[in-house]
């Protein structure tokens, strides 16, 4: 007998992450992604069931991972060629002079939080997304806009076809 959608157990809102501290100590656990960047600390549930609160200024990156057993840091930290996914192609320079590239959504409101979420260059690696607190960054540069729709020549001119001509023949 099929189970209706309202009787089904809700999908887990906790995602697997590895929190990398500024001193390069990794901490594995689960977080609720919607709270990242909105609070002064990260609430982490460890695999042992222990609750930890990690202050955001001590965090370098939060890696959303597929598995805890495989390496969490991307094999490649920069794109080998122009990315194919839509978004802003950015280069991040951390306070410890480490450099990483990634893609952020093409919505500037996403960049106003206390951190930024990027898609790493290694799409087939263990890290699906990376959250970087603003306090861990020294610099963030936009290298390009990928997938933006080109404006037509009529939009560039701003001339409407229904607009009357000044001198008609």
Segments from the language model and where they lie:
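Conserved RNA-binding domains used in RNP assembly and mRNA/RNA metabolism
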Residues: 1-169
């Amino acid at each position: 007998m099929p189970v209706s959608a309202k009787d089904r157990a809700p999908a887990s809102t906790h995602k697997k992450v590895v929190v990398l501290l500024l001193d390069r100590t990794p901490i594995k656990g689960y977080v609720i992604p919607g709270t990242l960047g909105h609070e002064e600390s990260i609430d982490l549930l460890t695999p042992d069931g222990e609750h930890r609160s990690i202050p955001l200024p001590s965090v370098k990156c939060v890696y959303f991972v597929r598995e805890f057993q495989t390496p969490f840091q991307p094999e490649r930290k920069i794109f080998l060629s122009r990315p194919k996914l839509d978004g802003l192609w950015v280069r991040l320079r951390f306070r410890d002079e480490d450099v990483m590239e990634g893609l952020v959504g093409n919505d500037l409101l996403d960049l106003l939080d206390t951190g930024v979420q990027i898609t790493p260059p290694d799409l087939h690696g263990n890290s699906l997304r990376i959250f970087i607190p603003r306090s861990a960054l020294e610099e963030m540069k936009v290298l390009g806009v990928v997938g933006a729709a080109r404006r037509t020549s009529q939009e560039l001119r701003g001339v409407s076809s229904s607009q009357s001509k000044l001198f008609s023949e």
